[in-house]
């Protein structure tokens, strides 16, 4: 909350009038350091237009800067071919979605732009600084059948993803 307090006090002087007028006291960027031990969930995020249509402040576009990559580290970004929404749904049901993704090998200092509406997942051995729009909205499409500490699979958001992904 300290950053929000600074924005409230100094308003446009801190972030610029245009940014303050658009985002108010809500800082528009979120920066995370992520170092996954396994593939993260396959997910997608809405863009600003879709987010506002469903009552959210903004969408989520991301950028990953690879701080450290193990020898075989990779990530998934987009599909490896054109697919239809029906093919997407079928691949989720038969657990073959991973076969449709575009995998990219990563190296130290690589940069990846992940626009909103693009399906993606960060792989193991790929420590990144993630710079993103401030948003908590993620539509999880597939979680590799993992079980949480309560013995349950995490919730998926297939309908939301279908409405979000650019096919």
Question: Where are the regions a protein language model picked out?
Answer:
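Transition-metal
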Residues: 1-83, 144-167
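Conserved metal-binding segment of the jelly-roll/cupin
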Residues: 42-45, 105-124, 133
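A short hydrophobic beta-strand segment most commonly corresponding to one strand
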Residues: 62-64, 121-145
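Active-site glycine-rich loop that binds ribose-phosphate moieties when present
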Residues: 83-113
């Amino acid at each position: 909350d300290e950053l929000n307090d600074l924005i409230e006090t100094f308003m446009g002087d801190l972030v610029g009038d245009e940014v303050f007028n658009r985002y108010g006291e809500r800082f528009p960027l979120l920066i995370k350091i992520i170092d996954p031990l396994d593939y993260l969930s396959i997910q997608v995020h809405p863009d600003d237009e879709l987010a506002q249509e469903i009552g959210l402040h903004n969408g989520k576009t991301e950028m990953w800067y690879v701080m450290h990559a193990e020898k075989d580290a990779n990530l998934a970004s987009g599909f490896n071919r054109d697919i239809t929404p029906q093919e997407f749904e079928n691949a989720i049901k038969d657990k073959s979605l991973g076969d449709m993704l575009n995998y990219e090998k990563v190296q130290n200092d690589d940069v990846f732009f992940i626009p909103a509406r693009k399906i993606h997942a960060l792989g193991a051995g790929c420590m990144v600084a993630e710079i993103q729009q401030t948003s908590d909205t993620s539509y999880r499409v597939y979680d590799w059948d993992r079980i949480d500490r309560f013995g349950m699979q995490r919730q998926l958001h297939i309908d939301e993803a279908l409405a979000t992904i650019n096919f």
